[in-house]
């Protein structure tokens, strides 16, 4: 039985592609290109750091990834330029169905689980007016590790005092779903871009194009 819903935040509740607008302010005509490269470099950096056990706070890796992209593409930048782009992580666009779905699921506990720090998460949730829908926020920056480290999911169940199979873990990121599924959570992959789930050994329990699809799942709990 599902007792709690755990949400990833970036790409799941908020559109990470909206960063192109913040990058566009600083680099007119190049915002989309920079934002896309930044996103992939950030994911790569986090995964490599996890593999070699060299933790660095998410907020710092965020800046490192952006600076790398700008250097590689020969863009000049100042500290203010970096801050303007990074500030976009606190102002991302919320996906259109999120507020309605969270309100409808008001009778089940919901938690945010993210690599970011609490300040970044709080600011993002408040600007979208959805901060009151969550029972708790578990920011991994305070624990010195990233998803998809198996120990991060142990922290989650210890904090929430639930069993693995009582958690419904929701993410749009495939690597996040694979790790959570292998740990023992029930998982729902939000396939917003209609892509293939190529990890044949591990499959999510549920797959939907948006959060609306989870309505039928929760009816059964």
Q: What residue spans do the PLM features occupy?
A:
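Alpha-helix C-terminal capping segments
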Residues: 23-27, 101-107, 218
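Asp-based, Mg2+/Mn2+-dependent phosphohydrolase catalytic module
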Residues: 1-5, 118, 122-221
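Short, surface-exposed acidic
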Residues: 29-37, 73-83, 132, 164
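Active-site neighborhood of HAD-like aspartate-dependent phosphohydrolases
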Residues: 1-43
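Substrate-recognition element of Asp-dependent hydrolases with the DxDx(T/V) motif
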Residues: 80-91, 98-127, 137-140
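Short glycine/proline-enriched coil/turn segments at helix->beta-strand junctions
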Residues: 29, 71, 105-109, 185
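A metal-dependent, Asp-based hydrolase signature
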Residues: 46-83
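An amphipathic alpha-helix signature
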Residues: 20, 35, 39, 59-67, ...
């Amino acid at each position: 039985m599902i007792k709690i819903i755990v949400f990833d935040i970036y790409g799941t509740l908020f559109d990470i592609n909206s960063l192109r607008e913040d990058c566009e302010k600083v680099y007119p005509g190049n915002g989309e290109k920079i934002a896309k490269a930044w996103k992939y470099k950030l994911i790569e950096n986090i995964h490599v750091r996890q593999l070699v056990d060299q933790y660095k706070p998410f907020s710092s890796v965020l800046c490192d990834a952006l600076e790398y992209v700008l250097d590689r593409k020969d863009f000049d930048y100042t500290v203010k330029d970096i801050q303007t782009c990074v500030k976009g992580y606190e102002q991302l666009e919320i996906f259109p169905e999120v507020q309605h779905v969270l309100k409808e699921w008001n009778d089940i506990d919901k938690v945010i689980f993210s690599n970011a720090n609490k300040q970044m998460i709080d600011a993002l949730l408040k600007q979208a007016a959805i901060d009151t829908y969550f029972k708790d926020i578990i920011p991994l920056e305070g624990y010195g590790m990233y998803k998809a480290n198996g120990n991060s999911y142990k922290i989650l169940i210890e904090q929430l005092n639930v069993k693995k199979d009582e958690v419904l873990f929701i993410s749009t990121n495939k690597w996040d779903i694979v790790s959570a599924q292998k740990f023992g959570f029930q998982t729902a992959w939000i396939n917003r871009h209609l892509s293939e789930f190529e990890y044949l050994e591990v499959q999510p329990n549920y797959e939907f194009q948006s959060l609306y699809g989870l309505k039928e799942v929760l009816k059964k709990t």
